[in-house]
A protein has these predicted regions:
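Amphipathic, small/basic residue-rich leader segments at the start of a protein or domain
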Residues: 1-109, 130, 134, 362, ...
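N-terminal glycine-rich flavin-associated loop
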Residues: 107-126, 152
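A short core secondary-structure module
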Residues: 167, 172-218
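A structural signal for short hydrophobic beta-strand segments in well-ordered beta-sheet cores
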Residues: 160-163
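A short, Trp-centered hydrophobic/proline-enriched beta-strand micro-motif
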Residues: 138-146, 188
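Glycine-rich beta->alpha junctions and the first turn(s) of the following alpha-helix
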Residues: 5, 215-312, 380
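C-terminal helix-coil-helix/basic helical segment that borders enzyme active sites and/or dimer interfaces
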Residues: 30, 295-298, 309-364
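Glycine-rich phosphate/cofactor-binding loops in nucleotide/flavin-utilizing enzymes
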Residues: 11, 92-93, 114, 254-269, ...
C-alpha cells in the first residue's frame, strides 16, 4: 500500500504526543557513571506483584493515550484499528519512544508482541475486529497458556483437554510457567481436542477468559526470590466456540505462529529496565574488581562487546525486513541462540572478575547487583523453547537437514 505520511511527519506527530504525555529522558541522567544511582539489574523488565495495580494503571493509561492518538498500532490494518503505515514507520516511532521516560510496559508485551500479531494472521475476522483494538489500546492483558508439567518445549504433547458441549467447550488441565497470568484478562490456550489423532494434529487453540469460573492462578517463586511466573489450573472452564482460534484440530499451526513472534523477540513495546545497560557498566565491573591489563579479562570483554553488537545488528536487520502482518520465520530463532551466547559470555566474565561477590553481598556498588541477572540467565535458555529444540528447528526448517530419527 502507499503510505499517506512520511516517517518524518509521523515522528513530528509522535514527538508532539510524547512531549505532552511523558517526560523526556535527561541525557545527563542517562549517561552511565560508575557508583551513581541504583545498581539494580534484571535480565528483563519485571512487574513487581506488590505494585501490580499501579503498574497496570500507568501502562494501560499510556497505551490508551497512544492508541487514541493514532500511534498505538502504526503498522496495523485500518480495518482492525491500526494506522495502516509501514513497519519502518512503526520502528521509527518505537525508537523515538526510547528517548522518553515511559511507564513499565512489560505487562503488555505478550499482547502486543506475541499474541496480537498471531491473531491478525490466523484468527477469524470477527475475533480480530473485536479483540485487536482492545489489545493494542491496552484494554486487555494477555497470557500464553502453552507449557504443561509434561509438555514444555514439546508443546505438541499438551494434555489439557477441550470437550465440545454444544456451542461451548469444557477445558480441563494444568499449565505452568505462565507469565502475567495473575494480571491477564485473556489467555491463548492450546488444548487436545482429539486424543486419538497424531499429537500434532489433535490440538485446538482457544482464547480463555482468565476471570471465568474454574480458572485458578498460583504464583511460582523462582530461585531469585521473585515470582514472575504462574501455574494455572483449568477445571471445566467454559469457552464459547466463537473464541476458538483457527480450525478444530489445527492448533499446532497457531502455536508456531505465536512462538515465531516470541522467539524472534520483535515487539513494539520499548524495552526499559531490563538488560545489562551500556557496555561501560561491564567495563566498570572489570575495572573496579578485576585487572583491565590482564589479557584474559580483555579477551572476555572483547567477546562480550562483540556479542552485544552482533545482537543489535541482527535484531535491527530482521525487524526492518518484516512487513506488516508478516509472521517471523524460523531463521528469527537465531536471535534466541545469540541472546543465550551473549548471556553465557557475560556470566563467565562476571564469575571470573567478581568471584564470591556474586553470592555474598559485601555492600560494594555494582557487585552483588549482578546476582539476580546471573540467577535469571538459565531461564532465558529455556524460555520460548529449549535451545536444543530451537537448534533442531533451525536445522530442519532453515538449513534443510533431515529430521531427527523418532521412536
Amino acid at each position: 500500500m502507499t503510505d499517506t505520511i512520511s516517517i518524518d511527519e509521523l515522528l513530528a506527530e509522535g514527538r508532539a504526543f510524547l512531549d505532552a504525555t511523558v517526560p523526556a529522558l535527561n541525557a545527563a541522567d542517562e549517561e552511565f557513571v560508575w557508583g551513581r544511582g541504583s545498581d539494580q539489574l534484571n535480565v528483563l523488565e519485571e512487574v513487581d506483584r506488590d505494585h501490580l495495580g499501579e503498574i497496570l494503571v500507568a501502562a494501560k493509561g499510556y497505551a490508551a493515550a497512544r492508541y487514541d492518538a493514532g500511534l498505538g498500532w502504526i503498522d496495523g490494518p485500518v480495518e482492525y484499528g491500526g494506522r495502516g503505515l509501514s513497519t519502518e514507520h512503526a520502528i521509527a516511532f518505537a525508537e523515538l519512544e526510547g528517548l522518553y521516560e515511559l511507564p513499565n510496559l512489560s505487562i503488555l508485551v505478550i499482547a502486543l508482541g506475541f499474541v496480537g500479531p498471531a491473531l491478525r494472521s490466523v484468527a477469524s475476522p470477527e475475533i480480530c475486529s473485536e479483540l485487536l483494538p482492545k489489545l493494542y489500546r491496552g484494554d486487555l492483558i494477555m497470557c500464553q497458556l502453552f507449557s504443561e508439567p509434561d509438555a514444555g518445549s514439546d508443546l505438541a504433547a499438551a494434555a489439557t483437554r477441550a470437550v465440545r458441549d454444544g456451542d461451548e467447550w469444557l477445558i480441563t488441565g494444568q499449565k505452568v510457567w505462565t507469565s502475567s497470568a495473575h494480571a491477564a484478562d485473556l489467555g491463548i490456550c492450546v488444548c487436545r481436542t482429539d486424543p486419538d489423532a497424531p499429537k500434532h494434529r489433535g490440538l485446538t487453540t482457544f482464547l480463555v477468559d482468565m476471570h471465568a469460573e474454574g480458572v485458578d492462578v498460583r504464583p511460582l517463586v523462582q530461585m531469585t526470590g521473585e515470582a514472575n511466573f504462574n501455574e494455572v489450573f483449568l477445571n471445566e472452564v467454559r469457552v464459547p466456540d466463537s473464541m476458538r482460534v483457527g480450525d478444530v484440530n489445527s492448533g499446532f499451526g497457531v502455536i508456531l505462529t505465536v512462538l515465531g513472534n516470541e522467539r524472534s523477540i520483535t515487539t513494539r513495546a520499548p524495552k526499559r529496565g531490563g538488560g545489562v545497560g551500556p557496555f561501560e557498566r561491564v567495563v566498570g565491573v572489570a575495572r573496579e574488581f578485576g585487572d583491565l591489563s590482564d589479557p584474559i579479562t580483555r579477551q572476555r570483554l572483547a567477546e562480550v562487546y562483540s556479542s552485544m553488537r552482533i545482537r543489535e545488528l541482527m535484531n535491527a536487520r530482521w525487524r526492518a525486513s518484516l512487513q506488516p502482518g508478516e509472521t517471523p520465520g524460523p531463521e528469527m530463532m537465531l536471535q534466541k541462540i545469540g541472546n543465550h551466547a551473549f548471556n553465557q559470555e557475560l556470566v563467565t566474565l562476571l564469575g571470573e572478575v567478581l568471584g564470591p561477590r556474586l553470592i555474598a553481598d559485601t555492600g560494594e556498588w555494582g557487585a552483588y547487583a549482578w546476582a539476580n541477572y546471573v540467577l535469571s540467565t538459565p531461564g532465558m535458555r529455556i524460555g520460548g523453547g529449549t535451545e536444543e529444540i530451537v537448534r533442531n528447528t533451525i536445522g530442519e526448517r532453515v538449513l534443510g537437514l533431515p529430521r531427527e530419527p523418532r521412536a
